[in-house]
Amino acid sequence: MGSFLRNRKFREIVQQAVVLSIVAALLVAMVMNTRASLEAQSLTTEFGFLDRSTGWDFSFSVLPFSISDTYRKTMLIGLLNTLLLGSLGIFFATLIGIVIGLIRTSRNKLFSSLGTVYVEIFRNVPLILQGVFWYSIVSHLPRPRSAISIGDAFFLSGRGFYFPVLNIAMWSVVLMFLLLVSWLIFLPWIRHRIERPSRYHQIKRTGWLILPVILVGIAYLARVPDTPLVNYPALKGLNFKGGMRMPPELSALVIAIALYGGAYIGEVVRAGLMSVPRGQIEAGFVNGLKNYHIFSRIRLPLAIRAVLPSLTNQYVQLMKATTIGIVVGFSDFFMIISTSINQSGQTLELLAILMGGFLMINLTIAFVMNTINKKIAIKGYEVKS
């Protein structure tokens, strides 16, 4: 027995078994206590309510919706609304972050100072306050008759942001998206299977020339009959008709998340650019490369490899930040779950759905980013997030 106790591996197994037993006992006790509490209140835990109609409506939906639709469809719409908000926020936050990161590393004192001021303001003001601030501005824009026009195609008003949209079938949108994603996956795959870089760049250039032609062809063939290819918004009476509308709640949240996330991503990009060894940059100058080529072929590729793990964390945080939509009345996943709890009383089931939904989204983001990180990592220098 003494020899077993002196064995380090045996002690570690015993310690882990004790900890797991304690955790399991606590979980069982929590489940039993919750079950007893629900039985005392004559409440049941079941998911049959998902097939009942909601009986209530909400302001924005990416899919057609009516009050007779089920809770199941309502949950799906809330999840899609959150994905839309999160995707737009992450996209624009990334663009802003790249610009801010470049400005922060600039040798120009004015640009560098402006970048610092931006980061300090938007990073230190709570996101929920920024959301309320931008919503108060967007909702007080002029009425449709006095809307701000941009090229007679884009209109800003207190009822939302109106912009042109293609009159094409939904299947074509899905097909074009799949083609674009397939091409982006194909590029890194073929890069590792072609020995000559010149051959790879030739295929890459040809693909980027052919792909837009294919996408335009699909859009033209899939357009709705007897309608123009592009549907422009136009003022008819007291409101705009045609085109597509982004409601003020969504617009304000996208602005808030993009500016807030851009400050953090800007710092991540700045750190990545500064992490590139000075010797490699000087080696580029020695080989006769110009500043642009040094940045695009040496500094930027190495910086991307360095920032991906931190960028993954920022994307996950920004996706979770979409829950502030309830403050301005945007029908995101969190708001719809909260309303469903009030209407149905199925608290535990709906909270489980909420946690499962965000867990699925964030694990997917982490998986995609980690896969990209592994694909572009230099062997021996992999960084795990």
Language model feature labels by segment:
Residues M1-S385:
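Transmembrane alpha-helices and adjacent helix-loop boundaries
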